[in-house]
């Protein structure tokens, strides 16, 4: 699919030793474009808890799995193919070793994501045995740090440091592109940072500034793109507005910004929610399938939409037939407003149905419990986001869904930050965020929230049984509802 969607998949990341950014437009911008692609995940809440070119931009097409986004790279000499989860919420690239406990089992657990065999690469070099990543539910991987050659988006990075999982409970490798201060060896052992992927692109001259932009496109699209070192003005509406990233425990380590307002709109009424939880610190995390908001806000949204909420799993359900209705949730960040249509919030739940026979869809907003709120893919699909690590800023605009237009601008060095973006006047910064370290996915408190069942989850039934593996988990939950266990 990558060649089909190459026009949709350019992400600019240009890094130049922590300096500010200026607008550059030329025939061959310094960007690297990477395609990202979608892949189906049967239970996004459980999955979230598990994972919490001289052309100086580098772009990559992303696979859109409805709930997760993947990119294809090769590692080593000769290249070994890997499919990695794109994750802005962590900072290490890691993959499973071919002889790991997981990949060596009889279930072919690593067939889809691929694995890495150090002994088969002539450019492999051992670094340390400090790789030890864990996620909110206790899963993770333990192994070594190493360096090797990475081929990504038509560009080559030499001596890139990455993690190899020899003992692993996660079959999915990860392409972490967050702050270096969130790397495993920093958080686990207090060691110095190393140049992770975006930083290495700067150091090796592929891009000019440590920044990239992300365009996931809509739920129906198979692909999106990440553009290292630049922005693609054809992929968003209006203008980019720039906000400061908030410090976590006194340092810049995660993409946390201040959410100042949430509103509900339908054909019959408009409601702006008031809550003591606002303004709230929210983490922008492409590795989270769903969006996790403060409980009081979620309760209001669920009440207005009559969501059927099942507390033990932390999942809300709505009739799939609501897709296409004029219902929106709007998020405000001091000044910028990002509007998410109901179509982008209804995820396939297989054959799960309400008792009246209507198909049930997973609702893409769930309660955060006691943890920091997370704006995951059910938000990010509706936003074009520039992650400016060099200047500790986020630039954001409403996405231009299914755009075939490309206008790539290089992020250079200078005082003006992101190309064509304007600074938000007097942005809210009085929010407190607690860091969770390297993770992909849901807040740990999501399953024990006090949000009530606005509509009885017992209204759900199993519908017509299917044997498809991707629907098995949800079908079992549905049966559990029916039996009243």
Curated annotation (Swiss-Prot):
The cross-references to Pfam families, in alphabetical order and at most eight, read: Asp (PF00026)
**Which enzyme class, named as a word?**
hydrolase
**Gene Ontology terms describing biological process:** fungal-type cell wall organization; proteolysis
Q: Which UniProt keywords apply?
A: Aspartyl protease, Cell membrane, Glycoprotein, GPI-anchor, Hydrolase, Lipoprotein, Membrane, Protease, Signal, Virulence, Zymogen
Function, as annotated, reads:
Probable GPI-anchored aspartic-type endopeptidase which contributes to virulence.
Q: What is the lineage of its organism?
A: Eukaryota, Fungi, Dikarya, Ascomycota, Pezizomycotina
Q: Which residues form the propeptide?
A: 462-485
Gene Ontology CC annotations of this record: extracellular region; fungal-type cell wall; plasma membrane; side of membrane
**Residues of the Peptidase A1 domain:** 69-397
Its signal peptide is: 1-20
Q: What is this protein called?
A: Probable aspartic-type endopeptidase opsB
Q: Where are the GPI-anchor amidated serine lipid anchors?
A: 461
Q: Topology with regard to the membrane?
A: Lipid-anchor; GPI-anchor
GO MF annotations in UniProt: aspartic-type endopeptidase activity
| Residues at the active site | 87, 285
**EC number annotated for this UniProt entry:** 3.4.23.-
Q: Which residues are glycosylated?
A: 72, 99, 107, 111, 132, 328, 337, 402
Family the entry assigns: Belongs to the peptidase A1 family.
Instruction: Quote the subcellular location field of this record.
Output: Cell membrane
């Amino acid at each position: 699919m990558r060649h089909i969607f190459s026009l949709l998949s350019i992400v600019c990341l240009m890094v130049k030793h922590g300096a500010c950014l200026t607008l550059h437009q030329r025939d061959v911008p310094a960007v690297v474009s990477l395609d990202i692609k979608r892949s189906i995940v049967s239970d996004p809440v459980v999955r979230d808890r598990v994972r919490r070119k001289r052309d100086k931009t580098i772009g990559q097409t992303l696979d859109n799995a409805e709930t997760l986004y993947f990119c294809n790279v090769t590692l080593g000499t000769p290249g070994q193919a890997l499919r990695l989860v794109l994750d802005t919420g962590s900072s290490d690239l890691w993959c499973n070793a071919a002889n790991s406990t997981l990949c060596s089992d009889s279930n072919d657990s690593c067939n889809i994501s691929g694995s890495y065999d150090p002994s088969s690469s002539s450019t492999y070099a051992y670094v340390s045995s400090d790789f030890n990543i864990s996620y909110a539910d206790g899963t993770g991987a333990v192994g070594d740090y190493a360096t090797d050659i990475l081929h990504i988006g038509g560009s080559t990075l030499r001596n890139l440091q990455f993690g190899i999982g020899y003992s692993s409970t996660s079959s999915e490798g990860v392409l972490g592109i967050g702050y270096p201060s969130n790397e495993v060896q920093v958080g686990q052992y207090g060691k110095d940072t190393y140049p992770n992927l975006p930083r290495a692109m700067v150091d090796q001259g592929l891009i000019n500034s440590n920044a990239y932009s992300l365009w996931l496109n809509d739920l129906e699209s198979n692909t999106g793109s990440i553009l290292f070192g630049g922005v693609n003005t054809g992929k968003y509406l209006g203008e980019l507005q720039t906000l400061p990233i908030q410090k976590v425990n006194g340092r810049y380590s995660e993409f946390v910004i201040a959410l100042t307002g949430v509103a509900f709109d339908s054909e019959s009424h408009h409601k702006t929610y008031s809550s003591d939880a606002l303004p709230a610190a929210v983490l922008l995390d492409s590795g989270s399938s769903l969006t996790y908001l403060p409980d009081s806000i979620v309760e209001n949204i669920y009440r207005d939409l009559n969501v059927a909420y099942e507390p033990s799993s932390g999942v809300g359900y709505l009739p799939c037939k609501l897709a296409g209705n004029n219902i929106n949730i709007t998020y405000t960040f001091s000044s910028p407003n990002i509007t998410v249509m109901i179509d982008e919030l209804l995820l396939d739940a297989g054959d799960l149905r309400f008792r009246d026979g209507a198909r049930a869809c997973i609702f893409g907003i769930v309660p955060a419990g006691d943890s920091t709120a997370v704006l995951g893919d059910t938000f990010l699909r509706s936003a074009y986001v520039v992650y400016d690590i060099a200047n500790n800023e986020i630039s954001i605009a409403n996405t231009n869904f299914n755009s075939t237009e490309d206008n790539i601008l290089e992020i250079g060095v200078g005082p003006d930050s992101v190309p064509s973006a304007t600074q938000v006047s007097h942005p809210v910064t009085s929010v407190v965020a607690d860091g969770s370290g390297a993770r992909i996915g849901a807040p740990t408190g999501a399953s024990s929230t006090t949000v009530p069942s606005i509509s009885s989850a017992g209204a759900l039934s199993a519908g017509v049984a299917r044997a498809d593996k991707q629907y098995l988990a949800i079908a079992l939950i549905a049966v559990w509802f029916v039996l009243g266990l």
